[in-house]
Amino acid sequence: MASFIWVQLKKTSEVDLAKPLVKFIQQTYPSGGEEQAQYCRAAEELSKLRRSALGRPLDKHEGALETLLRYYDQICSIEPKFPFSENQICLTFTWKDAFDKGSLFGGSVKLALASLGYEKSCVLFNCAALASQIAAEQNLDNDEGLKTAAKQYQFASGAFLHIKDTVLSALSREPTVDISPDTVGTLSLIMLAQAQEVFFLKATRDKMKDAIIAKLANQAADYFGDAFKQCQYKDALPKYFYFQEVFPTLAAKQCIMQANAEYHQSILAKQQKKFGEEIARLQHAAELIKNVASRYDEYVNVKDFSDKINRALAAAKKDNDFIYHDRVPDLKDLDPIGKATLVKPTPVNVPISQKFTDLFEKMVPVSVQQSLAVFSQRKADLVNRSIAQMREATTLANGVLASLNLPAAIEDVSGDTVPQSILTKSTAVVEQGGIQTVDQLIKELPELLQRNREILEESLRLLDEEEATDNDLRAKFKDRWQRTPSNDLYKPLRAEGAKFRAVLDKAVQADGQVKERYQSHRDTIALLCKPEPELNAAIPSANPAKTMQGSEVVNVLKSLLSNLDEIKKEREGLENDLKSVNFDMTSKFLTALAQDGVINEEALSVTELDRIYGGLTTKVQESLKKQEGLLKNIQVSHQEFSKMKQSNSEASLREEVLKNLATAYDNFVELVANLKEGTKFYNELTEILVRFQNKCSDIVFARKTERDELLKDLQQSIAREPSAPSIPPPAYQSSPAGGHATAPTPAPRTMPPAKPQPPARPPPPVLPANRVPPAAAATAPAGVGTASAAPPQTPGSAPPPQAQGPPYPTYPGYPGYCQMPMPMGYNPYTYGQYNMPYPPVYHQSPGQAPYPGPQQPTYPFPQPPQQSYYPQQ
């Protein structure tokens, strides 16, 4: 029986999985937390698992296969949890073609891609290949070996079939030949056929009914036939099928399985007293086995089976001739043998390994992470919008009060002292550092801005340089430069960079507005920073208005202002409540993903935000409406208060100064808040830009690594290309052997007199007719013709050793010299004394018999003499 077919493993380059995964984990999860530390340890374990599965030779044992399967399950598990792509987590996986042996000038074909799908396909290929090797190593003389072999062949068939269905969608370009759909589809058929063969062997060993065995064998022959047909697509499949015994082995096994089917069906025919059918089937089986023995004897040994069939055939013929005299039907008249399949490709359902434990079990998928990020943004927008509304309302209220000089107007009834509200504001400004604080904050802004600009420009410069290099190489190698253009790959990063640049431009405008407002109120703010005596001296005095003290309108204004202060305090509490709300949407998103397969983030987020923030946003709106009513009442009461006040220029001037001081305080508070917020913004933006720079640096480094690998592969492929096209043979050598057309005789050429003639050399010895070399009887190789002018061959005479050449000198350096193409079997090392760079051509005088070549048993066809023969002058 023929040996079983197994598949070689693919080889890969080492990849550090831990570093990029740890970097992503550190950027995504809070630093210092147990969750981050746990995931970082898991990333290290994953990198070790890859080295264990792919970084060392594997034994042909199920334990080694278990390691491969665990790694495959793990990368399938992490695929939805990490954003593996060229512009996010960029991991370049390099794999060599399993069937390509390379060349003298370069290694085997390999492909490097930044695709986890590519890694999955290659790892699954190795799982299937190792399963085929394990099955081929089994002892098929016991049930355990048969069971293991059948199981592993069916798994290998299913794995190859899975690659066939998924490889094109997993890769962004054409795969190497070994994992192309045609190749893995054929391998799947081969593995399935061998699994069926194992069941046939099991049925034979258990001595099951011949009808069942015949059907199993016939189905196996069918599978082997399908695989044999697939292998005939030479351009689509690797050389593996033609140079490592697969192609002839498949052909032999198809015939052997068909012969087994006929043999066991003949036994069934004998049992049914159909002796003619028995003989016909045995004859067909004998023909099939004879064909195998004659064509594929090098690969299979069918002597025992052949003897078994021949004995059965001889006995059947003898019995039929002497006893039954049953007519032997033609093969085409026989009923077809049925088929019974007991095998099918094992589907690939993750996890495949029975011992798989997910290292990142608690990590949520990327889709959930993305939904959480969008939800966090929605939450931040809602909170910021509510807080902004309250702050704007407070600013509006302060502005209205400042324009009305309240509460200073109702406190300043004496007209010659600083109102208490102004003193309070002055004290607050001094405690916060006064104008020195504002000056220092404004001074720091340009430095922070410049730092962020430099980080952003450096990040974009890295992309520009790599893209320019990629464009240069693409222009140089044209279609050979097969990788994603940097211009397309960097579009998301450039869009992100443009967004950061726009943010910085807006920040510059905001900084300008803050500085402009500060300059317009700087003097008044400086006045608030002065001690009380200086402040009192700077405020004009007015006539006393003691009669207004305790009036009804003043009491109404005080009550309204007190209510407004209460609203402001409530807003501070609401703002803290809005900021302090904290809840996790992970469980809801995971539940939705498990139930529906997708996450409707918008619907879930809006519903949950309304539930949690609905009460707080209602209070915010009530606060805004209450303030609106209070401001209207304050303005009405202030009009009455203004009518009651004594009207003079000094009072008006004093009121104007007090208004400016109140406005200056409000602007100071707002300026300090804006400047601190701007400083915080720039510092946070620096962290974001540093991450952006790291992202750009990582992808540029990965692209450079990919570029170096691609350049190396291109250099090797260029080195493997022929340096010059092959020279076609002369016309007189391309004529068919044995043809009757007379080769045209070229015109005689005159040799220049200045050239010395070569010295005469003796002719080679002539061998007697009874010493014809054995190689002389070999058939001349294709493409070497025989001139029609040669004398006809007689039995026992030596054939001409070479086609007759032109009757002019062919020695290098002489006119008319033309180097002849080497024969396909030429090997200069078979010559003992001369290593000639071209095959010599014999010349003879008209009528002279050709010279036979010396005997060289190791040469597959007649050899010319080792010295050129020159015509005697």
From Swiss-Prot:
Provide the positions where the record notes the PTM Phosphoserine: S486, S735
Residue ranges, compositional bias (Low complexity): 768-791
Sites of the modification Omega-N-methylarginine?
R749
Give the record's PTM text: May be phosphorylated on tyrosine residues by activated PDGFRB.
Region described as Disordered? 719-808, 837-873
User: Transmembrane region positions?
Assistant: none
Q: What is its main location?
A: cytoplasm
The residue ranges flagged as biased composition, category Pro residues, are 745-767, 792-808, 849-865
Instruction: List the GO biological process terms.
Output: actomyosin contractile ring assembly; apoptotic process; bicellular tight junction assembly; extracellular exosome biogenesis; macroautophagy; maintenance of epithelial cell apical/basal polarity; midbody abscission; mitotic cytokinesis
Task: For the region Self-association, give the residue spans.
Answer: 508-873
> Where does this one sit in the cell?
Cytoplasm, Cytosol; Melanosome; Cytoplasm, Cytoskeleton, Microtubule organizing center, Centrosome; Secreted, Extracellular exosome
User: In the record, which positions carry N-acetylalanine?
Assistant: A2
Give Gene Ontology CC terms.
actomyosin; bicellular tight junction; centrosome; cytosol; endoplasmic reticulum exit site; endosome; extracellular exosome; Flemming body
**Region feature (Interaction with TSG101):** 722-725
Q: Show the segment(s) annotated as Interaction with CEP55.
A: 802-811
Domain spans labelled BRO1: 3-397
* Keywords attached to this entry: Acetylation, Apoptosis, Cell cycle, Cell division, Cell junction, Cytoplasm, Cytoskeleton, Methylation, Phosphoprotein, Protein transport, Secreted, Tight junction, Transport
UniProt-listed PANTHER family: PCD6 INTERACTING PROTEIN-RELATED, PROGRAMMED CELL DEATH 6-INTERACTING PROTEIN
Q: What does this protein do?
A: Multifunctional protein involved in endocytosis, multivesicular body biogenesis, membrane repair, cytokinesis, apoptosis and maintenance of tight junction integrity. Class E VPS protein involved in concentration and sorting of cargo proteins of the multivesicular body (MVB) for incorporation into intralumenal vesicles (ILVs) that are generated by invagination and scission from the limiting membrane of the endosome. Binds to the phospholipid lysobisphosphatidic acid (LBPA) which is abundant in MVBs internal membranes.
Instruction: State the protein's name.
Output: Programmed cell death 6-interacting protein
